[in-house]
Amino acid sequence: MKKTILTLAMALTMGSAWAAKAWNMPITITQPDGTTITVFQHGDEDFSWYTSLDGTILNRIGNTFTPITESKEAFFTKAKKIRRANVMRREPVQGSSQAIFPHTGSPKALVILTEYQDKKFSIKNPKRSFNQYLNKEEGKQEEFGYRESKNYGSVRQYFSEMSNGQFTPQFDIVGPVTLPEDMTYYGGTSSKGNDERTAQMVVDACELVKDSVDFSLYDSNNDGYVDLVYVIYAGYGQSMGAANNTVWPKATYVRSQAEYNGKKIYRAGVNNELIGNENTFNGEPAITGLGLFIHEFSHCLGLPDFYASTLTSSIYDNQGMEDWSVMDNGIYKYNGWIPTAY
């Protein structure tokens, strides 16, 4: 496959927020009564659901799983309405220059490491670990005790290889900073089935670093908008089976009138610190795979999801790229540590 596929970004615009699909591996979850259950998660941010190993559809309330009481047909009829509402209620992303991150040269992106009031980073020195995760120019990553060396290369190396050296993004990391609210405030699932305040997380993170960051350095075309603000948040992400009050990783947009050094925030992305949930690797925290950041960052470049994006397709005939593209399930190859190409 030609590595010049990044040039596709020139012709694409973002129509809505884009999110990683659910991790399709068996997930072990400890329920409040101490029992464990192994489930599969399906779908994406717009609507996700769980099944047992024998295919029974399960309700999830907190970490308690029970079989649905309605028929499968009734469940998915309701699910389609919820998903459709989630897609339709979004404001279309503008097709102007601020909608897409530059995709040639070495543009800079601002990355903010954020903790919650009730959840801190498990990685002892997250800035050190994520600096090599994002920016290491060659060779293996150094091991600091959180499986960093499992990641193949770095995000920057990945895009350099995919573009034959034409695109080598730079990631300026600040933080960690502590958000003003608990995790549930930002990640708690609404009645519509998705995160409540992801964009607010981005704005709050910007407020916390505004005195130490010159945001004008991140507007490459001087159009008045920061090219990208990316947040890596402490803990686990909902797409990999963590609790419903965690944030689902995604690329999104921010509707805010706030200005920093004369620049507005618009394009944003977020993803989690760690792989899986509290039971993954016997509870030993492990840094998230490169694939997750690469997938969401690719949305910021203008690339769409390649997985089945309609509920009917994902239920009955999921004939997507699967493991053959990082914009589908290739995001999670070898836990995302060795993601596939486009």
What are these regions (language model features)?
Residues L228-Y230, A234-Y342:
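Extracellular hydrolytic enzyme modules, especially secreted metalloproteases
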Residues L6, V203-E207, G291-H299:
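A broad, structural surface signal
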